[in-house]
């Protein structure tokens, strides 16, 4: 690796005859236009540039969720434990796709990724081939949502480019399209990272579309926030029941769902989403 902060081997989508010195310089000055992988012998990391690490995969446990924010995104299962149809916008290293494919055998997953170079790295991250349960599309996420059929149980939005959160997927119209395509008890889950003032506006627009039925929790170790938006009318979490349900999910899926419930309940009672949304006004 040419980076002081990361040791290991760099994997790039380049021909064998490409000049290593030029590629190294492009990586360091952030002019290299494609995603790349760093393999340190224990994990593989997907980078969009030296400052933006998007995904991590443990080589010993490639189907586990290595990053805390991805674990918390699965918190939607507390409210919709048996989804039949999941749409993920933004493939990254495929962590969420692999987890859902392996641990939720009854679900159909569509992952929509705009960058063909990200999809080209799917084998490096052990993303399974397409089949009757999995479909990975190279397409625009907003266009896909506008044309797909209704009845999605969960939309997982983890859409970042080399500059951060994709602005094309931040409009009120886009979130209204998602709302329309969700099933009656469907959930939108959004990974928020980067500049707080920017994603505060995203929170506000989602709250407007989903009638304030939104919970936002922080992921302190990653610096991310996870947003859950609920289509169900008169959504009212039953926290005591959810605490018991969380223990069942932890036993089945191996994630700390009781901790997720604790954070969600606290954030809900403190109106954390509303407070964060005010930053964007």
Residue ranges of predicted features:
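SAM/dcSAM-binding transferase cores
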Residues: 1-41, 54-60, 77, 227-281
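S-adenosyl-L-methionine
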Residues: 44-51
């Amino acid at each position: 690796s040419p980076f002081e902060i990361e040791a290991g081997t760099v994997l790039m989508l380049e021909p064998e005859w490409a000049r290593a010195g030029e590629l190294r310089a492009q990586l360091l000055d952030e002019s290299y236009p494609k995603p790349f992988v760093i393999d340190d012998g224990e994990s593989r990391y997907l980078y969009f540039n030296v400052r933006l690490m998007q995904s991590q995969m443990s080589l010993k446990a490639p189907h586990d969720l290595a990053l805390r924010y991805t674990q918390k995104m699965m918190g939607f299962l507390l409210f919709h434990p048996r989804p039949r149809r999941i749409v993920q916008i933004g493939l990254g290293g495929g962590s969420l796709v692999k987890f859902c494919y392996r641990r939720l055998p009854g679900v159909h997953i569509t992952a929509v990724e705009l960058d063909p170079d990200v999809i080209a790295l799917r084998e490096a991250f052990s993303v399974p081939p397409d089949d009757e349960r999995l479909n990975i599309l190279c397409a625009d996420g907003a266009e896909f949502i506008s044309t797909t059929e209704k009845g999605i149980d969960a939309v997982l939005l983890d859409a970042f480019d080399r500059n951060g959160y994709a602005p094309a997927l931040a409009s009120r119209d886009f979130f209204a399209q998602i709302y329309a395509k969700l099933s009656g008890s469907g959930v939108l889950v959004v990974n928020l990272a980067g500049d707080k003032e920017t994603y505060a506006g995203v929170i506000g627009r989602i709250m407007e579309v989903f009638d304030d039925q939104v919970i936002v929790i922080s992921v302190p170790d990653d610096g991310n926030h996870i947003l859950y938006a609920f289509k169900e009318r008169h959504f009212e979490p039953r926290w005591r029941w959810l605490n018991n349900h969380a223990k069942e999910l932890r036993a089945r899926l191996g994630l700390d769902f009781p901790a997720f419930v604790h954070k969600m309940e606290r954030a809900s009672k403190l109106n954390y989403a509303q407070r964060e949304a005010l930053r964007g006004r």
